[in-house]
């Protein structure tokens, strides 16, 4: 592309992102029915997955920590509706991010970074549920863009509700 004088237009610097580390920050798995066992086909699980995200700047320039928090609850749909298991997982990543405009950094960190972490989160959840005595749970893909938009709408609503009526 050229400008009006025929000189090449200066290209915007290319966004650079590098995953420096990934780790389980915190994890808990509670098997509520371990003593009872899961004999028979009378168990119909109702799986609920809650996802939240957090990002913060680190002391090193261009480095950010992004944490994905998953809370997975399985209840028995039939009969008593007792909780079968509860899994809580905080999975983090350290990212080196450069050349992202300041006004786009927050959505970038809370959409693109969790997208890269998600396959590892899914694998951990699958392995832990299997190792906990249940069939492996393959969590559906999370739409992090929709999750980000819902959080923005929730914050806007909360801010609107907090403003005094004139």
Curated annotation (Swiss-Prot):
Subcellular location: Cytoplasm
Predominant localisation class: cytoplasm
Top-level division of the source organism's lineage: Bacteria
MF terms in GO: unfolded protein binding
Gene3D superfamilies: SecB-like (3.10.420.10)
Keyword Protein transport on entry: yes
Annotated Gene Ontology cellular component terms: cytoplasm
Keywords, sorted A to Z: Chaperone, Cytoplasm, Protein transport, Translocation, Transport
Short name of any one Pfam family annotated for the protein: SecB
GO biological process terms held by the UniProt record: protein folding; protein tetramerization; protein transport
Matching NCBIfam families: PRK05751.1-3, secB
Subunit record text: Homotetramer, a dimer of dimers. One homotetramer interacts with 1 SecA dimer.
Family recorded in the similarity comment: Belongs to the SecB family.
Role according to the record: One of the proteins required for the normal export of preproteins out of the cell cytoplasm. It is a molecular chaperone that binds to a subset of precursor proteins, maintaining them in a translocation-competent state. It also specifically binds to its receptor SecA.
Descriptive protein name: Protein-export protein SecB
Lineage: Bacteria, Pseudomonadati, Pseudomonadota, Alphaproteobacteria, Rhodobacterales
